[in-house]
Amino acid sequence: MFGKAGLGGLMKQAQQMQENMKKAQAKLAETEIEGEAGNGLVKITMTCAHEVRKIDISPDLIQEAADDKEMLEDLILAALKSARDKAEETANKTMGAFAQGLPPGVGDFFR
């Protein structure tokens, strides 16, 4: 089905694709996104590899939530989910580019 040259070219192409994927994954591990809740009262910064780097809670919210621990917890959770969703979206867009042109289903292995 493949000649020596065809198979060799295919292997070289696969190796190049793997190297490019590793570079993209490394870049995603450093790419920071921000999720927020409560109109910016709670902000969470995380990488596209889901490493939380920063949690910022507005001083105004801390005063308001002094007697409402549950509200503060809900806002932190909502900001975390927002950040996670943005990280997933960014990662899927980046890694999805590697799946273009592959047979159906094969691209799922690269996500």
UniProtKB/Swiss-Prot annotation:
Superkingdom of this protein's organism: Bacteria
The answer to whether keyword DNA-binding applies is: yes
GO cellular component, as recorded: bacterial nucleoid; cytosol
Keyword Hydrolase applies: no
Which keywords appear in this protein's UniProt record, sorted alphabetically? Cytoplasm, DNA-binding
* Subcellular location, principal: cytoplasm
Q: Which Pfam families match?
A: YbaB_DNA_bd
Family statement drawn from the similarity comment of this UniProt entry: Belongs to the YbaB/EbfC family.
Task: Please identify the protein, giving its name as recorded.
Answer: Nucleoid-associated protein NMCC_1355
